[in-house]
Amino acid sequence: LNESEIKKKFNDKPFKERVIKLASAKAAVISAKNPESYVIGADQMCVCGEDILDKAGNFENAVKILSMLSGKTHQQYSGVCVFYNGESLWSYADQASLTMHKLSQEEIISYIKTDEPFQCSGCYKFESHGVNLFLKVYLIVQVKWHHLLLLY
C-alpha cells in the first residue's frame, strides 16, 4: 500500500476525508484477504498549517519536525473504519488541535531518545511521554447529535 499515492490522489479533499481514505485503503487490503472477518482500519494525519507532516523515519528528521511544531498549534486528524467482505460498513474521522510547549533543542533531543517516535504521526507518542510536550489539547467529539468538548 503506497500512502503517498493515496495522499496525492485525494489532495483536493478535506483532511478528514483524506484520513478516512487512508484508513479505508488499509482495511480494504486486509478485508479482501479475509472476507469473512470484520476488519478495523485506522490512520492519523498530522497537519501544520496546510502541510501534512510525514513520519520522521529517523532521528534527524524527528528533530526537524519537533522543532517546527515547537510553540505552535497543529492538528491531528484520526480516521477509523470497519470493513466486512470487502465493503465499508462504517467510518468516522475527527480532529484535535494541539499546542506544543516551546521546546529547547535539548528537550527535543531528550524526548526523541526517550520515546523514539520515528514512525508516529507528528513525531510524538501522545500516549507515552509525548503528552508532556503539550500546553493545550482541544478536541470536539461528535456523539450522535451531541458534541462533547474535551480539553486537556
PLM-predicted stretches and their roles:
Residues L1-E3, G79-E87, Q119-N132:
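Mobile beta-alpha loop/short-helix "lid" or hinge segments that flank ligand
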Residues L1-Y38, D51, L103-E106:
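N-terminal polybasic phosphate/anion-binding patch
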Residues S4-I6, M45-V47, E87-D94, L135-Y138:
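Acidic/polar active-site rim loop that often engages polyanionic ligands
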Residues R18, Q44-H74, M100-K102:
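Active-site-adjacent loop/tail segments of enzyme domains
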Residues A23, D43, A62, V80, ...:
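Residue-level signal for inorganic ion chemistry
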Residues S37-Y38, H74-Q75, G79-C81:
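Structural motif
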Residues V63-S67, S78-A96:
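Anionic-ligand binding region
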Residues K72, Q95-Y152:
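GST superfamily/GST-like fold recognition
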